[in-house]
């Protein structure tokens, strides 16, 4: 097996927590476990002390409109390392830096399209209208993805978006989740009051996640109590919405929890509700199902392949609160149906592992390096185990 030196460039990383962070962290760990040398290039955080030698922190500034996020502000001295290949995960300053370095050093550049960027334009005043008038966001993304040697996306639902950017032959590789951490979670006190039906939803409390629709649905299930695991800018709005619905006493905003404990909350839930229609994949759906929790979710883009519809859960049309309520009520009132879907959910949720995903990514690397498939993957017995990175969970999708 040939060992590579790989640079993973990402504009969001620990201590941030979201789907991209989870994806990059798991990929880095598994590539190292298969014998490759990996360096994650990410923004620094003023109060975060980096303890891992495989993470290169780049100077950053605070986002004007998103004060909890950092925007990398790289200089030439930040990039004295050399790689056999660069893999970018975001189209901002570090992603574009990775693209330029690959071109300068004449090495392959692989890019993963994790996020439907236009859906997040509302975070920057004027960006949505600028995109509508000029296509600025799409053109910037096309600069990165259209010039990559290979493009990966987690779901087939993103293929049309990439083709609109004139990306040729994108490869679908699902983002993995690490079952070891979820399944080994220590017991935690139940956040659900005794005697209530236990409904869970997980994610960053942000407008595009549409947790207001989840509240609307649970308001129509009088014996249910909703737990929201995650934090974000919409918390005050969602709490006020719960008050308006007269259900403030039936909702618990759990906030941030250590990643090692998250599996314990999934394990206690009876049902997972999710209403976001902007997901590239919806990792939380996979996590819930891995822990045996049936899912009722909006079917749109990435979530269309995130649930085995009718077996591990149900997908409903965008914005259809009545359908969310109908399927939730059916699952909670029929023990035999719930048991069957719980068993199917465990099987479906375990369908992607970090090892399998890394092997698929390594085959993409081999292709752009003009090597035969399998050249870069270690035999199973040759893998070395690495402990998952410790991290705190603030909500990802």
Residue positions per predicted region:
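Conserved acidic donor-binding segment of nucleotide-sugar-dependent glycosyltransferases
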Residues: 308-310, 314-321, 330-335, 350
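Donor nucleotide-sugar binding/catalytic pocket of nucleotide-sugar-dependent glycosyltransferases
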Residues: 42, 56, 131-185, 194
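Short acidic/histidine- and often glycine-rich active-site loop of Leloir-type glycosyltransferases
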Residues: 120, 300-310, 314-315
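Nucleotide-activated donor-binding/catalytic signature segment of Leloir-type glycosyltransferases, i.e.
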Residues: 239-257
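Short alpha-helical donor nucleotide-sugar binding micro-motif in glycosyltransferases
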Residues: 145, 256-257, 264-269, 361
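Short hydrophobic beta-strand element within catalytic cores of glycosyltransferases
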Residues: 285, 294-298
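Aromatic "clamp/platform" in nucleotide-sugar-dependent glycosyltransferases that forms part
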Residues: 277
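A conserved mid-protein helix/loop that constitutes part of the nucleotide-sugar donor-binding site
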Residues: 22, 197-220, 233-239, 322
